Each structure stands twice: as C-alpha cells, then as structure tokens.
C-alpha cells in the first residue's frame, strides 16, 4: 500500500481481506475465529504475568502461525474484547511480515504506535464493515450504543470510534457518547 496514515492503511487492508473472502458486502457478523482458522492460524490461551499484554502473535519458518490470548488481560475475558484482539492479531500475522520472515508481536502499551493503530483500524473494519453498519440505525444515545454493540458483538468504545471514523457521527456526538459510556 502507498504511504498513508496507519488507521487509513488498516481500514484498506481489512477491506482487501474481506473482499478476498467475498465478505465485504455481507451484512452478517464475521466469525473471526473461523476466518483465523481458514488463514491457518492456531489460537490458544496463555496466562501471562503481565496483564497489560492482550495477546502474542507468532509466525516464522518451521511452525504454524499462532495467536496466544492472555487470559489474564481484562479485555480478552469478554467475547467482544476477544473478537477484537483476535482480529487485531490477525492483522499482525497477515500484514506485519514479509513472506517467510518471522514475526513475534506482543500487543501491549509499549508496542509500536503506528503498527498498533493500523491493527486496531483493521480489527474495527473487519468486525464492522459498512454493509453491516448500514443494516442498523446509527445510535443516538448511550442505550442505543449499548444495544447495537451487543447485537454486533463489539465493544461500545470500538463501535463509537468506528462510527466516527466512518462518518456516521460527528466529533461532538462521539465525545458525548464516549463520556457517557
């Protein structure tokens, strides 16, 4: 991809992944675990002492790409958080290594900012493509955000930020909704 903002690049990479799998126009909720399996990635849980680390993505010659979800991280304990973290790690495995090059990426507070922003945007677009969002009315208050986030199986903040990034809500509404969640 040409040089661009990490979030824009993440959105574009997710759109490419969805189109490649004929899921971009689908208004159905993505089974990210199945997509991960189809990509040949194994997913396991691990109990890391550092609770800030959400997951580890590993790939390289001689072994199958893998994601290890840190069961001690609070985000990974919810279905919505687990789906987002898995989609985020899938971005690292698909796009943060050249063919045949090894990758060891831990998602935590000290990970490279641009790489993490791109993976976050990838995860949001993968889980909330336009065809899925357009199927539902844009939430106008916190209760509608909670309801739609539960329906779409994503986090409330993920939903609000993605709606803003996609132009469904303005900056004022975004701030109001985030303050009230």
PLM regions: where:
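Short juxta-domain linker segments that transition from a proline/glycine-rich
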Residues: 1-181
């Amino acid at each position: 991809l040409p040089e661009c903002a990490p979030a824009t690049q993440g959105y574009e990479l997710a759109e490419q992944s969805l189109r490649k799998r004929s899921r971009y126009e689908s208004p159905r909720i993505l089974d990210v675990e199945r997509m991960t399996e189809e990509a040949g990635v194994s997913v396991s849980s691990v109990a890391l002492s550092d609770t800030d680390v959400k997951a580890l993505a590993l790939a390289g010659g001689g072994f199958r790409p893998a994601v290890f979800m840190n069961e001690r991280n609070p985000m990974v304990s919810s279905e919505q958080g687990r789906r987002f973290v898995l989609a985020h790690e899938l971005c690292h495995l698909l796009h943060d290594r050249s063919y045949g090059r090894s990758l060891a990426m831990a998602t935590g507070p000290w990970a490279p900012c641009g790489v993490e922003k791109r993976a976050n945007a990838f995860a949001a677009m993968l889980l909330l493509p336009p065809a899925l969002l357009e199927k539902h009315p844009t939430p106008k208050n916190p209760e509608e955000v909670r309801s739609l986030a539960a329906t779409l199986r994503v986090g409330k903040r993920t939903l609000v930020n993605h709606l803003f990034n996609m132009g469904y809500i303005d900056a004022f509404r975004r701030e109001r909704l985030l303050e009230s969640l």
